[in-house]
Amino acid sequence: MWIKELELKHYRNYDHLLASFSSGLNVFIGNNAQGKTNFLEAIYFLSLTRSHRTRADKELIHFDHSTVSLTGKIQRISGTVDLEINLSDKGRVTKINALKQAKLSDYIGTMMVVLFAPEDLQLVKGAPSLRRKFIDIDLGQIKPVYLSELSHYNHVLKQRNSYLKSAQQIDAAFLAVLDEQLAGYGARVMEHRIDFINALEKEANTHHQAISNGLESLSLSYQSSVVFDKKTNIYQQFLHQLEKNHQKDFFRKNTSVGPHRDDLAFYINGMNANFASQGQHRSLILSLKMAEVSLMKALTGDNPILLLDDVMSELDNTRQTKLLETVIKENVQTFITTTSLDHLSQLPEGIRIFHVTKGTVQIDSDIH
């Protein structure tokens, strides 16, 4: 898939913008604080209905307006789709082909994106919540039902934690009802995650071995707070651990086990990647991003859109070449932001260049 056209009204520093793109490489050049990242954020937002930079929708609204509108024309294998998101103080409205979508899981996945931004370099050593977010964003696009299961799980988790904080003593019967619901939704969330990580590991290891010239292997490990022996037993064993932890959870006023506490570990040649070099970290993250692209295509039959936000300067020539070779080979529409073309080596033919200045975008040329 690829985005043919994007229109922004009152988004960040863009008062009004209408732009069309190449189905291949699109490079946005400009000084810092001109709107390059805002532009990629808008594409990300149109796909996932959320920003990767802020949780406050009001920050997305142009300073002298009260509403935001984003519309995009997406070319999928199945045909052209029109997406629209409108933000106001009354909330958020999402539409597909002018039809309002009642559920998030009905909208997300229509346009898939993979974002590679500087903050992704913290994925290995950062907080576990970063790695859970990484899993959730990818899985939500590949399997929209996952978002529904995760939403139900978080709703019951909130109920259970609220009860634990307010209760003067344990009502075992009431907790048992919440435990059964939490274990049911949680087990399905974990099953989806396990399948996804197993598939991602295969793709990422293939890319990592290519980048390292066969010198390094990459493996991933899903680390669950729920102790289980096999996937088919997760529900029963999760439920048992919830029941076993009633007193502990009551004392701590929160739920001590479940997918909300799970993590993802990375290993290079069997060694925890927390101890890897900076160069190995960059290769690992690059391998993951390329694996996201190839896995989405393998599981959905369509390519995602790749957003490279100011990361090419973080990669040496070898890693840049591997990345560009992959997107060209897989025919992936790619958006790159940079302050200068000097950071980019071996650019292919057929790219479209845009200049970004103070919330305006001008097409420079198509290079053939």
Swiss-Prot record:
Which residues does the record give as ATP binding sites? 30-37
Ordered alphabetically, the record's keywords are:
ATP-binding, Cytoplasm, DNA damage, DNA repair, DNA replication, DNA-binding, Nucleotide-binding, SOS response
State its location(s).
Cytoplasm
A GO molecular function assigned to this protein is: ATP binding
Gene Ontology biological process terms in this record: DNA replication; DNA synthesis involved in DNA repair; double-strand break repair; SOS response
Alphabetical list of PROSITE patterns matching this protein: RECF_1, RECF_2
Top-rank taxon of the source lineage equals: Bacteria
Pfam families linked = SMC_N
Residue ranges spanning the membrane: these are: none
| A Gene Ontology cellular-component term | cytoplasm
Q: What does this protein do?
A: The RecF protein is involved in DNA metabolism; it is required for DNA replication and normal SOS inducibility. RecF binds preferentially to single-stranded, linear DNA. It also seems to bind ATP.
HAMAP family in the record: RecF (MF_00365)
**What is the name attached to this protein's record?**
DNA replication and repair protein RecF
Q: Which organism is it from?
A: Streptococcus pyogenes serotype M6 (strain ATCC BAA-946 / MGAS10394)
